[in-house]
A protein has these predicted regions:
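Short, Lys/Arg-rich, polar N-terminal cytosolic tail immediately upstream
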Residues: 1-13
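N-terminal signal-anchor transmembrane alpha helix
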Residues: 14-44
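Hydrophobic cores of alpha-helical transmembrane segments in multi-pass inner/ER membrane proteins
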Residues: 24-28, 83-91, 144-153, 205-219
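Extracytosolic (periplasmic/ER-lumenal) interhelical loops and adjacent juxtamembrane/interface segments
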Residues: 44-71
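Individual transmembrane alpha-helix segments
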Residues: 65-100
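Cytoplasmic juxtamembrane regions at transmembrane-helix boundaries
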Residues: 89-117
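Membrane-proximal helix-loop-helix units in multi-pass membrane proteins
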Residues: 109-157
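Terminal transmembrane helical module of multi-pass membrane proteins
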Residues: 152-232
Length: 232
């Protein structure tokens, strides 16, 4: 790669990193605001007030009507902003994560990752109360692709320590997402009982995802700076 193309790639990486971080910040603020405005009700406590991280799913926030029967318009609007921001963050994240991998694997990651991101957009447009079947299908398809991407990212970078926060958070995101998907299938399709376990696992999977994204962006920028210093 010549110096001009290398500089261009470095600029693209930096631009994607800034956008990814900004979108993650919007997601965190918007999802917190949406949760604070949720009227109440969960599948295990239909008459409860407010949003419970251990009893409510994120998709409860995008319902037109809360589970307790109250209007959920305000929370729905903010949660749609939150999930759109997360989807944008992921859209810019996949090329960043791919930059740490061998070229062929990185290109595959970018394609699969961006397809899974489109599924996240679709989930916001297909709330579970209005489209229960399609919401589940899109969630499982997008989640499966996302888990494949996380597995691709578990590979160790050349200069990376054997045990790193980037790889540990990727493994955590992968395992928690797999457990969340298994619990979803058990409840939705095998008709298992509703418990606080799945909503709790979902929140842990989200935290692991955000941590993995943040650490990966930092790692990619550090690798870029090292490469730039070596080239000078």
């Amino acid at each position: 790669m010549n110096s001009a193309s290398s500089a261009s790639a470095s600029e693209r990486l930096g631009r994607a990193a800034r956008r990814c971080r900004a979108a993650l910040s919007v997601f965190a603020l918007a999802i917190a605001a949406a949760a604070s405005l949720y009227p109440g009700g969960s599948w295990t406590e239909p008459g409860a007030a407010g949003f419970s991280p251990l009893r409510n799913f994120w998709c409860d926030l995008v319902r037109t009507q809360a589970i307790n029967g109250a209007d959920n318009s305000a929370s729905r609007r903010l949660s749609c902003v939150a999930f759109a921001a997360l989807a944008c963050a992921l859209w810019w994240f996949w090329p960043i994560a791919g930059a740490l991998l061998p070229p062929g694997r990185g290109a595959l990651l970018q394609v699969l990752g961006r397809i899974s991101t489109l599924a996240l957009f679709a989930m916001a447009l297909l709330p579970s109360d209005a489209h229960p079947v399609w919401h589940g299908v899109v969630a499982l398809a997008g989640g499966g692709l996302g888990m494949t991407c996380a597995a691709l990212c578990c590979i160790r970078c050349p200069a990376e320590p054997r045990y790193s926060l980037r790889r540990a958070s990727a493994y955590a995101a992968l395992l928690l997402a797999a457990l969340n998907a298994a619990l979803y299938i058990y409840v939705a399709y095998v008709h298992g009982p509703e418990t606080p376990l799945q909503p709790g696992v979902q929140k842990l999977a989200t935290l692991a995802l955000v941590l993995w994204m943040a650490v990966t962006v930092r790692r990619a920028l550090a690798e870029r700076d090292l490469s730039g210093a070596a080239a000078r």
